[in-house]
Amino acid sequence: MLKKKILIIDDEQDYCMIMKSYFTRKGYEVFLASTLKEGMKILNDSRPDILFLDNNLPDGKGWLMIDQIIESRSDLKIFLVSAFRQEFESIKPTDQITIWEKPISFTHLNSAFG
């Protein structure tokens, strides 16, 4: 059975390493990107099943890419993450999009990913 793939686009290195460690232990293949440009390349090349996308990145607002990402990957489960609650007002959760406030707890992760 193929491993599920997760892409984490976030410029906070500590957060990325904690998430990578968590998901690697769960049997996922994990890809990390610290910029939108790098993340979009990995998204297209590696075809992950799940995306964790931060909003405030060095090269732009991650959440502005949502429509483009959904258009090309309607099968992708997306978790939008931010430490800034006011950013959530512009996005509506759907079956495909989940919004989580940072810091993400292991309780949230365990409830979503077992």
Where are these regions (language model features)?
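Acidic catalytic/metal-coordinating carboxylates
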Residues: 35, 61-64
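Short amphipathic alpha-helix used as the core "switch/output" element in two-component signaling
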Residues: 63-74
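The feature encodes the CheY-like receiver
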Residues: 58
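C-terminal output helix
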Residues: 104-113
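Acidic, metal-coordinating helix/loop segments flanking the phosphotransfer/catalytic sites
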Residues: 32-50
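Two-component/phosphorelay signaling modules centered on CheY-like receiver
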Residues: 13-31, 97
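Active-site residues of response regulator receiver
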Residues: 54
